Design a protein with these regions (language model features):
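Sigma70-family region 2
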Residues: 2-4, 30, 41-58, 77-79, ...
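C-terminal flanking helix
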Residues: 22, 43, 109, 113, ...
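Structural recognition of an alpha-helix C-terminal capping motif at a helix-to-coil junction
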Residues: 23, 37-44, 57-69
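Arg/Lys-rich amphipathic alpha helix in sigma70-family domain 2
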Residues: 48, 54, 64-84, 146
Length: 159
């Protein structure tokens, strides 16, 4: 069945992964239009290559790795790094209580923001994140620890 997932239609692919990839790219890029572009490029690469995977987890990891690389390319090419406003986040359907957390998360350095998003939002283990980012699991654990500390300071200092 996993091999069939590499051959699913574009609509099925978007339904299955589109929203999670968009949230991930939005956190990395801080710009909805750039996030949409990164998701489209990621899905296009998937469709062009038609990779086969042994499991849905491997497929998902491949997509998020490609999306992360696309986001990094966008950040390298950009001369500025716009940040989402609270109004833009509210327009994406976030609850008011989530806005403070999302705003604080957006203010963190990329390496912490990325680790926290992959672990707590997307549900990846430290080992999976380490593999995606080319780091050791212990380095990811340290990023998560430091990221939580920074996020707490961001949230409570902002009150």
């Amino acid at each position: 069945m996993a091999a069939d997932s590499g051959r699913c239609g574009a609509g099925q692919l978007v339904d299955k992964y589109g929203s999670a990839l968009f949230r991930f790219c939005l956190v990395m890029l801080r710009n909805a239009a750039d996030a949409e572009d990164a998701v489209q490029e990621t899905l296009l690469r998937y469709i062009e290559r038609s990779p086969e995977f042994e499991s849905a987890g491997a497929e998902r990891a491949w997509l998020f790795t490609v999306a992360a690389n696309r986001c990094r390319d966008t950040l390298r090419a950009a001369s500025r790094h716009p940040q989402l406003t609270l109004d833009e986040l509210a327009g994406l359907g976030a609850e008011k209580s989530e806005l403070g957390i999302l705003d604080a998360l957006m203010n963190l350095p990329e390496k912490y923001r990325l680790a926290l998003t992959l672990h707590y939002v997307e549900g990846y283990s430290t080992g999976e994140i380490a593999s995606m980012l080319g780091r050791t699991p212990s380095a990811i654990k340290m990023r998560l620890k430091k990221g939580r500390e920074l996020l707490g300071k961001e949230i409570f200092d902002g009150e």
